[in-house]
Amino acid sequence: MFELNGKVCLVTGGSRGLGESMALTFAQSGAEAVIITYNSDENKAIEVCKKIETHGSKSMAIHLEASNLDSIKKMVTNVENEFSKIDVLVNNAGINRQAKMDDVKEEDWDDIMAVNLKGPFFCSRE
């Protein structure tokens, strides 16, 4: 295990799956704060925040449209206003469309690329 004492960690897509596991591991490793983002299920995000806090870390859940630059900027501003820094960023948010390649519509492909490529780029840049 590693130590994250005093570190502020942000995990996009941290309200479920691998993102949730990483967020909880950061809390278990002594992070000062773990911030998670969610897209649709605020109640699940709140539940994860409560789990994070059982390990002594502060938590915050922020709604994020990962493909939207304004949403990303708002998220970063909220985190910096509350914690003044971000030490660890995990670009975990992502989407997929379950379909055969021939059945994927152009709009679906554009959405996938916006969330999975554009989102991490802008989160890292901001």
Each PLM stretch: what is its role?
Residues 100-101, 105-113:
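Substrate-binding pocket helix/loop in short-chain dehydrogenase/reductase
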Residues 1-10, 28:
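Flexible N-terminal pre-Rossmann segment of NAD(P)-dependent oxidoreductases
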Residues 124-125:
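A short, exposed helix-loop element centered on a Lys and neighboring polar residues
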